[in-house]
């Protein structure tokens, strides 16, 4: 039996996941970060995108986070995010629409503040689409 650690994925609204896992993979500023049982303590920011959780027995579940923090202790990992969703609960059409809207706003460039807001919205929509692609790849579609 593989060694496990406790994983909690929490958004500003609620706890999305809590359970024993074999590994958690998230995207940090310097690339993907895999956390397994006994990992050295760590606190790092994470980028918007997928967080993969490999549960006991090897089953995988994918979540979308809008960015946030990853806290690692040797036997516990916590993902703190402003927004966190199960990838299965995401709407691809809404993510594509948000991406198109942000691209349109970037093209207009009404003001510096609007440009920055549109750039953030575009990055979040792209991260949502990456998460949806990851779950489709996992399902073999």
From Swiss-Prot:
Keyword line: ATP synthesis, Cell inner membrane, Cell membrane, CF(1), Hydrogen ion transport, Ion transport, Membrane, Transport
Gene Ontology terms, MF aspect: ATP binding; proton-transporting ATP synthase activity, rotational mechanism
Location in or out of the cell: Cell inner membrane
Origin superkingdom: Bacteria
What's in the GO CC field?
plasma membrane; proton-transporting ATP synthase complex
Give the signal peptide as a residue range, or say none if absent: none
Q: Which Pfam families match?
A: ATP-synt_DE, ATP-synt_DE_N
Q: How does it assemble?
A: F-type ATPases have 2 components, CF(1) - the catalytic core - and CF(0) - the membrane proton channel. CF(1) has five subunits: alpha(3), beta(3), gamma(1), delta(1), epsilon(1). CF(0) has three main subunits: a, b and c.
Put simply, this protein is called ATP synthase epsilon chain
- Lineage of the organism: Bacteria, Pseudomonadati, Pseudomonadota, Gammaproteobacteria, Cellvibrionales
């Amino acid at each position: 039996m593989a060694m496990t650690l406790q994983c909690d994925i929490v958004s500003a609204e609620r706890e999305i996941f809590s359970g024993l896992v074999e590994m958690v993979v998230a995207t940090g500023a310097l690339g993907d970060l895999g956390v397994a049982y006994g990992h050295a303590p760590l606190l790092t920011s994470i980028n918007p995108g997928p967080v993969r959780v490999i549960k006991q027995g090897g089953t995988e579940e994918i979540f979308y986070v809008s960015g946030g923090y990853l806290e690692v202790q040797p036997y516990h990992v916590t993902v703190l995010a402003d927004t966190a969703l199960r990838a299965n609960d995401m709407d691809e059409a809404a993510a594509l629409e948000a991406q198109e809207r942000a691209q349109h706003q970037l093209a207009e460039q009404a003001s510096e503040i609007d440009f920055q807001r549109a750039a953030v919205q575009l990055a979040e929509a792209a991260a949502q689409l990456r998460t949806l692609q990851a779950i489709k790849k996992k399902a073999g579609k």
